[in-house]
């Protein structure tokens, strides 16, 4: 019985650590919409700087949008949507 208890505590701690160390790769969202990089001259540099401002580790242009690596967990997964007026 002790072995089962120790194993369950180990699993609980392991799952808790996995949640802390999880990171996300996301398309960059600024002002509620995806950031376009299609027509920019310095595609890689602009996306990299914008992503780092959002606390990502790196960014690049994955046309037509900027793509950021290792985004914070609380970063939006979708752009803002507006309900249509009826």
From Swiss-Prot:
Keywords, comma-separated and alphabetical: Disulfide bond, Ion channel impairing toxin, Neurotoxin, Secreted, Signal, Toxin, Voltage-gated sodium channel impairing toxin
SUPFAM superfamilies recorded: Scorpion toxin-like
Function: Binds to sodium channels (Nav) and affects the channel activation process.
Domain remarks: Has the structural arrangement of an alpha-helix connected to antiparallel beta-sheets by disulfide bonds (CS-alpha/beta).
Domain of life, source organism: Eukaryota
Subcellular localization, as worded in the UniProt entry: Secreted
Disulfide bond entries: 37-61, 47-66, 51-68
Signal peptide span: 1-22
Family (UniProt): Belongs to the long (3 C-C) scorpion toxin superfamily. Sodium channel inhibitor family. Beta subfamily.
Name used for this protein in its record: Mesotoxin-1
Organism (species): Olivierus martensii
GO MF annotation terms: sodium channel inhibitor activity; toxin activity
InterPro entries membership: LCN-type_CS_alpha_beta_dom, Scorpion_toxin-like_sf, Scorpion_toxinL/defensin
GO cellular component: extracellular region
Domain (LCN-type CS-alpha/beta): residue spans on this chain: 24-86
Tissue: Expressed by the venom gland.
Keyword Nuclease in annotation: no
């Amino acid at each position: 019985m002790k072995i089962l208890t120790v194993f369950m505590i180990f699993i609980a701690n392991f799952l808790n650590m996995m949640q802390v160390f999880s990171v996300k790769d996301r398309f960059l969202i600024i002002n509620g919409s995806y950031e376009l990089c299609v027509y920019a001259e310095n595609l890689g540099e602009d996306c990299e700087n914008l992503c780092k401002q959002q606390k990502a580790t790196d960014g690049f242009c994955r046309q037509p949008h900027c793509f950021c690596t290792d985004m914070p967990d609380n970063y939006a997964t979708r752009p803002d949507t507006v309900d249509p007026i009826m």
